[in-house]
UniProtKB/Swiss-Prot annotation:
GO CC annotations on file: plasma membrane; proton-transporting two-sector ATPase complex, catalytic domain
Protein name according to UniProt: A-type ATP synthase subunit E
Transmembrane segments: none
GO biological process: proton motive force-driven plasma membrane ATP synthesis
Gene3D superfamilies named in the record: ATP synthase, E subunit, C-terminal, F1F0 ATP synthase subunit B, membrane domain
Subunit comment: Has multiple subunits with at least A(3), B(3), C, D, E, F, H, I and proteolipid K(x).
Length: 198
C-alpha cells in the first residue's frame, strides 16, 4: 500500500467517525422529538436522519477530495525536488569533467551542430575557457570534421558546450549544456515520474 492509499484510508476512517457522530446526534434528537409529539416527530426524525446522512456524505467527499489534492501536490513537490537534484548532479559532473573528457564532449557537440547546419563555414561561440580549448586544438578538430572552416566568435555566458551558427548568423544551433539540459528536461521528468509513480 503506497503513501497516497494510506492517507486516503485514514481520511475514510476519519470520515466514518464523523458520520457516526453526526448520525448519533441525529438519532438522539429524533428520540426527543418522538417523545414530545410522536406523530409529527416521526416525519421530522426521518428528515433529520436523511439530512445528517447527506451532510456526512458530503463531508466525507470533501475530505477525500482534499486528501487527493494534497497527495497530488506532495507527489509533484517530491518529483520536482528529485528533478532539481538530478539536474544539479548533472551540472556538477559537467563542471568537474577532465579537460580531455570536456574536449571530447565539445567535439561531439560541434560535430552534431555542423552536421545539422550542413555548412562549410561556421562561427562558434562559447565561454572563454571553451573557446581557448577549441583554439588550442583547432587542427585536431578540423582533421575530424573534414572540410569545414571554423571561426571563433564572441564569448557567451554558459557553463559549457557551444553555440554554432552559419557564417551570416541566420541559423544557430545552441548546443550549450544549459540548452541541452532544457531540451531533455521533459524526457528527464517523464523518466523520473515513471520510476517514482509507475
Amino acid at each position: 500500500m503506497n503513501g497516497a492509499e494510506l492517507i486516503i484510508q485514514e481520511i475514510n476512517k476519519e470520515a466514518e467517525r464523523k458520520i457516526e457522530y453526526i448520525l448519533n446526534e441525529a438519532r438522539q434528537q429524533a428520540e426527543k422529538i418522538k417523545e414530545e409529539a410522536r406523530r409529527n416527530a416521526e416525519a421530522k426524525a426521518e428528515w433529520i436522519i436523511r439530512r445528517a446522512k447527506t451532510q456526512a456524505e458530503l463531508e466525507k467527499q470533501r475530505i477525500i477530495a482534499n486528501a487527493r489534492l494534497e497527495v497530488r501536490r506532495k507527489r509533484l513537490a517530491i518529483q520536482e525536488e528529485i528533478i532539481s537534484s538530478v539536474l544539479e548532479e548533472v551540472k556538477r559532473r559537467l563542471e568537474t569533467m577532465s579537460e580531455d573528457e570536456y574536449f571530447e564532449s565539445v567535439k561531439a557537440l560541434l560535430k552534431e551542430a555542423i552536421k545539422e547546419l550542413n555548412e562549410k563555414k561556421v562561427r562558434v561561440m562559447s565561454n572563454e575557457k571553451t573557446l581557448g580549448l577549441i583554439a588550442s586544438r583547432i587542427e585536431e578538430i578540423k582533421s575530424e570534421l573534414g572540410d569545414v572552416s571554423i571561426e571563433l566568435g564572441e564569448t557567451v555566458d554558459t557553463m559549457g558546450g557551444v553555440i554554432v551558427e552559419t557564417e551570416d548568423g541566420r541559423i544557430r544551433i545552441d548546443n550549450t549544456f544549459e540548452a541541452r539540459m532544457e531540451r531533455f528536461e521533459g524526457e528527464i521528468r517523464s523518466t523520473i515520474a515513471k520510476v517514482l509513480f509507475g
